[in-house]
Structure formats: C-alpha cells, structure tokens
Amino acid sequence: MDDKVEEPIDFIMKHCLWQSHSRNWDRERQNEEILKKTKQLLCGEPVDLSTPSDRCYWVDAVSLVDAYRERYTWINAMSKDELAQLIDTLKARLDYLTISGSLNEELSDKNY
C-alpha cells in the first residue's frame, strides 16, 4: 500500500491549502477530520454534517475524493478495506510530513 500513497500525498501537498496551517493542533485536526470524511466518502459510508466544522471538512473531502477518482483511476477498483487502509497509510504519512517530521519551529511555538 505504501507504493500507492505517494501520488495522493503529492496531490495534497501541491493543491490543498488546509495542510499548511501554522500550528500543530490545527494541522492535526485538519488532517484527521478531512481524511476521516474522505475515507467515509470513498467507502460509501454516512458522513456527519451536523456542525459547520463538519460541513467545512466535508467540502474539502468531496474535492479530494473527486480529484482522486479522476486522477488515480486505480482507486476506483479498490475494495472498502483497501480504501480504508490507503487513507490510514496516507494520513500517517501526511502527519509525518506536515507535523512530526516538519522542521517548521513555528508549529510548536507556544506564543504563536
């Protein structure tokens, strides 16, 4: 699954501004919520839209799913289990690239 993750990660890094928030907790929340909703949409599961935040994350997830289905047609042939594993692996990689492995010291500045 790791070999399939880099293309979708590259798309996020180049096209999705939500991965660029200036604080760790913002990035953690964005990654978690948007990718959770992305997984739900890809797997045909219900998505919670009860709060304004949920709807905001959902819009980003819909855009991501549409782009992935169009650009990476191999996603359309994956089972629900494979899709869930792909998104889980993608999230771990994105968290590393944008949070834990980032050299941006502002992410953890308590005064920022």
Curated annotation (Swiss-Prot):
Alphabetized GO MF terms: ATP binding; iron ion binding; iron-sulfur cluster binding; nitrogenase activity
EC numbers for this chain: 1.18.6.1
Keyword Metal-binding: yes
Pfam families reported for this sequence: AnfG_VnfG
Cofactor: iron-sulfur cluster
Keyword Magnesium: no
GO annotation, biological process: nitrogen fixation
Enzyme category, top tier: oxidoreductase
InterPro entries membership: Nase_Fe-Fe_dsu (IPR014278), V/Nase_d_su (IPR004349)
Signal peptide, first to last residue: none
Catalytic activity, as annotated: N2 + 8 reduced [2Fe-2S]-[ferredoxin] + 16 ATP + 16 H2O = H2 + 8 oxidized [2Fe-2S]-[ferredoxin] + 2 NH4(+) + 16 ADP + 16 phosphate + 6 H(+)
Keyword field: ATP-binding, Iron, Iron-sulfur, Metal-binding, Nitrogen fixation, Nucleotide-binding, Oxidoreductase
Family annotation (NCBIfam families): anfG_nitrog
Oligomer and partners: Hexamer of two alpha, two beta, and two delta chains.
Function: The key enzymatic reactions in nitrogen fixation are catalyzed by the nitrogenase complex, which has 2 components: the iron protein (component 2) and a component 1 which is either a molybdenum-iron protein, a vanadium-iron, or an iron-iron protein.
Protein name from the UniProt record: Nitrogenase iron-iron protein delta chain
